[in-house]
Structures are given as C-alpha cells and as structure tokens.
C-alpha cells in the first residue's frame, strides 16, 4: 500500500497557495492510488524549535549518556524521520519567502538531517539513507524566478533532498501570484496543468 506524506510549510494557516496546490496534488495522487494512506504534517501547527544548545546537545550526545530531556528531543527527531522513512511519496508545499524556503521548512530539515540516521559519510563521500522515494515540491511564488539568480529555493531543495537520498524530485511552480489578478490566474492554471500531468 502506498503511503503519501504531505508536508505543509507555509507560515499562514489559511489562504496559503502552496498548501492549496499541495492539497490538489495529493488528491491527484490518491486518484491513481485509491488505497493510499495519506499523512499530512503542518509545520506551522506542529512547530519545531530552531536549533539551539539543547537540541544540538541532544543530537550529539551518545545515547547512553543522554538525559531524559535529551532523550525526548531525539525521540521527536526519530519520529519525524520514521514518518519520512515510511512514506513512498512525499509532497512538500513550499512557498518562496525572500528567495528561499520558510523558516518552518528549514527548521524541519535541521531536525531530520542527522549523520548516521538520514545520511552517512563514507570514503566515497556522503551517502543519503532515505532512498527510493518520489518527491513533489509545490512552490508558490509572488514573482517569477525559475531559471533566474533569484531562485535560490530550487537548488537548495534539490541539494538537501538529494543529500538525504531523495533524488527523484519533481517541482510544480506557481509563479507570479503577486503580479496582479491575470498573472495570478495564469500561475494557478499553469500549476494545475502540471498537477494534472502527474
């Protein structure tokens, strides 16, 4: 049975275009996999703390030396990683904020990037350990950035996801959402055309 994990990373709980389009993409995937299990994670509703001394200390303390507080921190990270590991398909709603990803998504990545767990270092270089997954990134943007120097989001996501083993990544863009009603309608139509082709 296929498991689809949808990760919503918008900073808005209502009206986020990336979440709306991610919902539509997940629904399209369900049409092709009627028995699929869907899990939705909202990085806004279930906010993670930014990395600090406590979190880093927990991650880098040997298991047998961790305090109860550190064990709880690592258990949270482990749960997030297990959720990813159990998913066959991952849909990420990723709005572009100031040319990059939301702080919610960056923090989530910080909580799942753990040496020896989601990647490891080898004599041949780093190896991602979360392999064999299909990832869709739905990126909603106020301006138009694809192929431009201002698009630091696409290479960052491609690099990070590849680093942990997720190399089969398809991007769906909704660009120009803040450039007026006509541009916004065109952006949504273009994104929905891409979703229909999935």
Swiss-Prot record:
Organism, scientific name: Burkholderia thailandensis (strain ATCC 700388 / DSM 13276 / CCUG 48851 / CIP 106301 / E264)
PANTHER family registered for this protein in UniProt: FMN-DEPENDENT NADH-AZOREDUCTASE 1, FMN-DEPENDENT NADH:QUINONE OXIDOREDUCTASE
Family: Belongs to the azoreductase type 1 family.
Cofactor(s), by name: FMN
Co-factor binding comment: Binds 1 FMN per subunit.
Superkingdom: Bacteria
Name this protein carries in UniProt: FMN-dependent NADH:quinone oxidoreductase
Name of the gene: azoR
Keyword Nucleotide-binding assigned: no
EC identifiers of the protein: 1.6.5.-, 1.7.1.17
Reactions that this protein is recorded to catalyse: 2 a quinone + NADH + H(+) = 2 a 1,4-benzosemiquinone + NAD(+); N,N-dimethyl-1,4-phenylenediamine + anthranilate + 2 NAD(+) = 2-(4-dimethylaminophenyl)diazenylbenzoate + 2 NADH + 2 H(+)
SUPFAM superfamilies, sorted: Flavoproteins
Function summary: Quinone reductase that provides resistance to thiol-specific stress caused by electrophilic quinones. Also exhibits azoreductase activity. Catalyzes the reductive cleavage of the azo bond in aromatic azo compounds to the corresponding amines.
Entry's Gene Ontology molecular function annotations: electron transfer activity; FMN binding; oxidoreductase activity, acting on NAD(P)H as acceptor; oxidoreductase activity, acting on NAD(P)H, quinone or similar compound as acceptor
Assembly and interaction partners: Homodimer.
Residues bound to FMN: 96-99
InterPro entries: Flavodoxin_fold (IPR003680), Flavoprotein-like_sf (IPR029039), FMN-dep_NADH:Q_OxRdtase_AzoR1 (IPR050104), NADH:quinone_OxRdtase_FMN_depd (IPR023048)
Keywords per UniProt: Flavoprotein, FMN, NAD, Oxidoreductase
């Amino acid at each position: 049975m296929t498991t689809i994990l949808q990760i919503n990373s918008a900073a808005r709980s209502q009206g986020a275009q990336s979440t709306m389009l991610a919902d539509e993409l997940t629904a399209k995937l369900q049409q092709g996999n009627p028995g699929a299990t869907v899990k939705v994670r909202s990085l806004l509703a279930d906010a993670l703390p930014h990395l600090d001394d406590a979190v880093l200390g927990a991650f880098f303390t040997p298991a047998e030396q961790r305090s109860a507080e550190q064990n709880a921190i690592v258990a949270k990270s482990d749960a997030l990683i297990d959720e990813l590991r159990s998913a066959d398909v991952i849909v990420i709603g990723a709005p572009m904020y100031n040319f990059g990803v939301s702080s919610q998504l960056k923090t989530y990545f910080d909580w799942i990037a753990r040496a020896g767990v989601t990647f490891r270092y080898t004599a041949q270089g780093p190896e991602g350990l979360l392999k064999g997954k299909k990832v869709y990134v739905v990126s909603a943007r106020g301006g138009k950035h694809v192929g431009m120097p201002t698009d630091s989001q696409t290479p960052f996501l491609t690099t990070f996801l590849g680093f942990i083993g997720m190399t089969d990544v398809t991007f769906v863009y909704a660009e120009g959402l803040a450039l007026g009603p006509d541009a916004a309608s065109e952006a949504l139509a273009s994104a929905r055309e891409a979703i229909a082709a999935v």
